[in-house]
């Protein structure tokens, strides 16, 4: 890992905050998507079965993104991959509402899965580097921040949906 957090940032607190921010963003994006699934289903007029098929795109993307991220992290450093994957995850979250059919929703979710799977691996690799600098277990704090992000993303997504804003 040529560009790990441990080698690029001096103060461990700054590195911890940076990685925690990525965990929060990842959780918020996931939380926001989950609460908008019914709206996307309704907008596309998908049956429960058709939605289930389309949702299969997310784990398909994860199957690609997870190993891709590991390879990319070795080649370019997990810090760089984390940044690119976070931007990609946020960008691909905009695709499901733009889908015009179950097939395009599936394709959008494959891309979302690739990006979010890549982010998951890269940010956890960064978290391991930060944890090593602390010389004590702190990994659970990153995962707690992910959960907090999920809560925040769900709350915002739910509030926006309640206001009648389309997916």
Give the role of each language-model region:
Residues 79-89:
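Primarily marks hydrophobic transmembrane alpha-helices of the MFS/SLC 12-helix fold
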Residues 97-108:
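Helix-loop junctions at membrane interfaces in 12-TM secondary transporters
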Residues 63-78, 161:
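Helix-to-loop junctions at the C-terminal end of transmembrane segments
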Residues 142, 146-167:
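Helix-loop-helix hairpin linking two adjacent transmembrane segments in secondary transporters
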Residues 109-144:
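Cytoplasmic helix-loop-helix junction between adjacent transmembrane helices
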Residues 31, 58-67, 150-151:
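Residue-level signature of mid-helix packing/kink "hotspots" within the transmembrane helices
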Residues 15, 37, 46-55, 139:
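Juxtamembrane helix-start elements in MFS-like secondary transporters
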């Amino acid at each position: 890992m040529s560009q790990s957090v441990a080698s690029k940032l001096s103060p461990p607190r700054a590195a911890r905050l940076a990685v925690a921010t990525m965990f929060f963003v990842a959780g918020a994006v996931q939380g926001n998507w989950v609460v908008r699934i019914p709206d996307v289903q309704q907008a596309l007029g998908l049956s429960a079965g058709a939605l289930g098929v389309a949702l299969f795109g997310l784990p398909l993307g994860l199957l690609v993104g997870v190993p891709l991220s590991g390879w990319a992290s070795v080649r370019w450093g997990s810090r760089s991959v984390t940044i690119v994957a976070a931007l990609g995850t946020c960008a691909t979250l905009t695709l499901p509402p733009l889908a015009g059919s179950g097939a395009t929703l599936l394709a959008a979710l494959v891309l979302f899965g690739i990006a979010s799977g890549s982010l998951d691996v890269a940010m956890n690799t960064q978290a391991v580097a930060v944890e090593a600098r602390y010389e004590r277990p702190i990994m659970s704090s990153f995962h707690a921040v992910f959960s907090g992000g999920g809560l925040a993303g769900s709350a915002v997504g739910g509030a926006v949906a309640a206001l009648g804003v389309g997916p």
